[in-house]
Amino acid sequence: MARYTGPSWKVSRRLGISLSGTGKELERRPYAPGQHGPTQRKKISEYGLQQAEKQKLRHMYGLTERQFKNTFNKAGKLQGKHGENFMILLEQRLDNIVYRLGLARTRRAARQLVNHGHITVDGKRVDIPSYQVSVGQVISVREKSAKNSAIAESLDVSSFVPEYVTFDAETLTGSLNRIPERSELAAEINEAFIVEFYSR
C-alpha cells in the first residue's frame, strides 16, 4: 500500500486525530468528512476498532502498510511488551526525532528534510527516514542547510521538546538522551488493539 499524500486534514477528521499536531483540523469540523459526517452513528465492530487504531497510528507516523507491519514484526522480537516496543521503535525513527527536535512542523516535513539530505547523524549524512536513532547519537542540520527557511520557520513556532530528547538551537544539534517511556507517547493510541489486529 502506497503512502497517502493527499490532504492530511481529511484523514485527521476521518480518524479523529490531528496529524499536524496543531489540532486545527478538528476545531471547526470535529467529525468525519462527507455529506453525513456530523450525524454518522455507525456501530463499529471489534475488528473495525482494531483496524481504526492501526490506521490512526500508521497515518500519525506517515508510514506505508508494509513499513508499519515490518516495524511491528521487529518489535515482536524484542523483550518486553510487543505494543509498547512497537510505539518506541516508531518514536526512534530519524524523521520522528527530527520532528520532536522542532526542526520540522510536521512528520511529513521532517521526512522531506531527511530525504533531501539536510540531516546528519554523528556527523554523517543520513537520508533514510526510517533510520533507527540510538540513545546518545547526535542529530544535526548540515552546515549547508543551516539557513533553510522551513527549518527556521519551524523553530520560530516550536516550543515543546520532549524530555527524552535534547536540543541546542544555536548549533541546530540534538540527541535522543534516553528511551522514551510509554506514558510520554501518544495517549490517544491503544496499541493493544493493534497487537490484536495483527494477531488475528
Curated annotation (Swiss-Prot):
Entries under InterPro entries matching the protein: Ribosomal_uS4, Ribosomal_uS4_bac-type, Ribosomal_uS4_CS, Ribosomal_uS4_N, S4_RNA-bd, S4_RNA-bd_sf
Cellular component GO terms held in the UniProt record: small ribosomal subunit
Keyword field contains Ion transport: no
Gene3D superfamilies listed in its UniProt record: Ribosomal Protein S4 Delta 41, Chain A, domain 1, RNA-binding S4 domain
One Pfam family per UniProt: Ribosomal_S4
Molecular functions per Gene Ontology: rRNA binding; structural constituent of ribosome
Residues of the S4 RNA-binding domain: 92-170
Annotated protein name in UniProt: Small ribosomal subunit protein uS4
Keywords attached to this entry: Ribonucleoprotein, Ribosomal protein, RNA-binding, rRNA-binding
Gene Ontology terms describing biological process: ribosomal small subunit biogenesis; translation
Region Disordered: start-end pairs: 22-43
UniProt keyword annotation of Repeat present: no
Family of this protein: Belongs to the universal ribosomal protein uS4 family.
Free-text function comment from the UniProt entry: One of the primary rRNA binding proteins, it binds directly to 16S rRNA where it nucleates assembly of the body of the 30S subunit. With S5 and S12 plays an important role in translational accuracy.
Organism ancestry: Bacteria, Bacillati, Bacillota, Bacilli, Bacillales
Domain of life: Bacteria
PANTHER family in UniProt: 30S 40S RIBOSOMAL PROTEIN (PTHR11831), SMALL RIBOSOMAL SUBUNIT PROTEIN US4M (PTHR11831:SF4)
Gene this protein is translated from: rpsD
Assembly and binders: Part of the 30S ribosomal subunit. Contacts protein S5. The interaction surface between S4 and S5 is involved in control of translational fidelity.
